Every structure is written in structure tokens, then in C-alpha cells.
Amino acid sequence: VAGFAALASLAELIEVPGLSYSLMLGPWGVDWLALLAVLVLVALAARRRRPGRARSLAVLLLTLALVITAGVGWRQVDFARSQGVRLDLWALTGIGQSGSQPDVQPVVLDDTDTGQLLQAGVWLPRDGRGGVLGAGSTGAPASSGRSARSDSPVGVVVLLHGGGWSNGNRLNPMTRGQAAWFASQGYLAIALDYPLSTPDLATWQLAESRVACGLAWVASHAEGYGGDARHLALVGDSAGGNLALEITYRQALGQLDPVDEECGSEVPQIDAVSTTYPIADPVGFHDNPDLVMAPFVSERARRYTSGTPGQVPERYEAIDPRRKLALLAQRGMGPSLPPTLIVHGARDHVVPVDGTRSLDAALEEAGAPHTTLIAPLTDHVFDLNPGSALSQTWRHLTLDLLTQAAVLPAER
């Protein structure tokens, strides 16, 4: 146990195939640190009762693991503080951070083309005590799209889950945790399903068209849930981040597919887009160099597009947000784009960070308003504990982004 703990901790600093996924423990760094401290104390007590080389070695290895883990955790905390974040120390433990279930889960579309039922998870805006803002005796929200205390509009945050385009739904742990948090800040938060790819169904076109459908549904229903879809931001992680970027930039280009009447009248204007570890380079995602993850990741890309980049290059190009940014740059439209936020771990083993670096370069070339953060010693799903240091950093920056874009919460 001591040897494995030391090796796994060392792999947080030095790349070790397979073991370096220990970085994914980062979201629970405080818990892992506490466990290691207990193990060190147990090992010290055992050595005191029965001294020996094996017990001394166990103490040494566990202490090494404790020191390395503390160092990695401190580096992430220091990074968060450098962004102006005042960390909630209790949230770092992950206790109580998983988020509540949605208040309602209405059907958005019974998708006959895919055979999948697409729903929305709706988290109603909360007051400072956790109560639904403007709720009456039935618990229903105010239906004006305005704050119960003022005439200011209540912004809407729409979330798109990750899962390699083939897994997950509106209740993914990261999505649920962040949606509940946005609602606690006074926003109307809505997480949308989109059709998942299967071995027999490539959804590279359908997923984007159904997200557009979901947004049109939000525009038609937000007021009934106490929000104003004229002030709307998109949020997405991993594959959901790809979809959020794609929809935002396609809307700017006027390339969104027409939506069915069943969805709603039209897709609302997207005012801001905030992503975590997005798939910005679909080819790079397929060609993931990680020795362990590569087969699983490339299979998801092939399932989504029904082929490899060599077999269907046009499909990989069609889902690449950087290509849309290049078109926007050519047309001089970059400066008028909605502001974009990207936060990505420098040691992401699932979605290579080089995709985000190239996306950042494309945004810079286009002159688009954006903020890109590459977090040190951080892997994929750093918000699996939504209260982790990096998740809190992303939240802090996202609130700044929403304020910049005039997507504001209810006054409480």
C-alpha cells in the first residue's frame, strides 16, 4: 500500500502510463491528503510498536506520498488564488457538492430519427436561503422572466454534458453539480440532452441540430420557469464543450439548421460561452497519444463520425470549431463574437490540451474576446468534485464572463 501510494503520487509529477491518472484524484485532494496523513500516523505507530526496516520504509514512502500530494494541491490552490479566487475550503472536500436533482425534467423532443427521448433538467433560480425565487404556495417560479425584487431580467445558463458524444445525459455529475450551483447564484439553469452516438448511429450532425432544437425550446419555455432567454449563456464540458463552441460559432456564421416547430420558434442569441476541457480538435482527440486511453477515446470519435479522420475527413472538419473561427476571421467578425472562456488541465489524458492551445490561437487570430487558462498539474474532469479548486476557479471566471455579457442573475 505504501509503495503504491508513493508511486501514484510521484506519477502526479512525472508521466507514468496508467498511474498518472492519479491526477484525477485532484478534485478530492483534501480527502486524499487526509487519508495519507492517517496512513502515516498508523505506520508510525506500527513502527514504534515493532521497529523494523519494512515499517521504516512504509513510513518513508507514505510521507513521500503525503508531501507530493500536498505540493500538488498547494500548486492548484496557488493557481486559483492567482486568478483572484477566494476558495471555499469546505467545498474542497466534495461534501455536499454533488448538486440537487432538477426541479423539473420536461421532455424537449421525442426524437424519431434517433429513437431517443431528449429531456431537459431545469434548476429554478434560488434566493440566498435556497428557496425558489418568486415561488408561490405551489412552489412554482415567477413567470415573468424577471427578478421577484426588480425589473431586471433573470439570465439563463444552458449546460451541455460531456461523455465523448456517446455517454451521459443532463444528470452527469459535473453537469448536475454546476447547474445546481448556477441556480444557487440566482440563474435559471437548464441542462439539455442531445442524441448519443451508438455503433449503428453516427450523430455528428444530429447532435448539433438537436442542441439547436433544445435552445429553441429554452427560448419558448424559459419565461415560464422564471428566466429571460434574451440573456443566455452556453456552458459545456468535454464533448459538450465542443457542441457549445460549435453552436456559438455556427450561429455567428448564420449556419444553424432550421429548427422544427416542435422545438420552438427560433434559437435565441447566445451571449457567452464557457467551457471546460472542450474537444476543440476532433482529429487530435481521435489521435490521442496516451498509451492507455487512446483505444477508448478514438473509438468514441469513430462512433460519432462513423469513421477515422482518414476515412471521413470532411466530418471531422465539420465538427471542428477552429475552422469556423477561421471563417469568422476572414469575414472580420471575430471581435463581435460572444466572449469565450476555456479552462483546461495541462495534463489532460482524455482530451489533449493541444486542442485548446490551437483554439486559443484561432481566437486570438480572429480578434475574438476570450480567456484561456491552462491549469498546471490538472487532468480531465477536474470538476468531478464541483467544489474542487479548479472548478471554483472556473466558476469565478464564468461569473465574470456572464457579467461582461450582461447575463445576470436575479437580484436577491
Language-model regions, residue ranges each:
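N-terminal cap/lid segment of alpha/beta-hydrolase-fold proteins
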Residues: 18, 22-28, 79-141, 145-151
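Catalytic nucleophile-loop/oxyanion-hole region of alpha/beta-hydrolase
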Residues: 169-179, 190-229, 385-392
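Membrane-embedded alpha-helical segments of integral membrane proteins
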Residues: 2-46
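Conserved alpha/beta-hydrolase "acid-adjacent" motif
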Residues: 349-358
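Primarily recognizes the serine-hydrolase "nucleophile elbow" in alpha/beta-hydrolase
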Residues: 216-288
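Mobile cap/lid helix-loop segments that gate and shape the active-site cleft of serine hydrolases
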Residues: 12-24, 112, 284-330
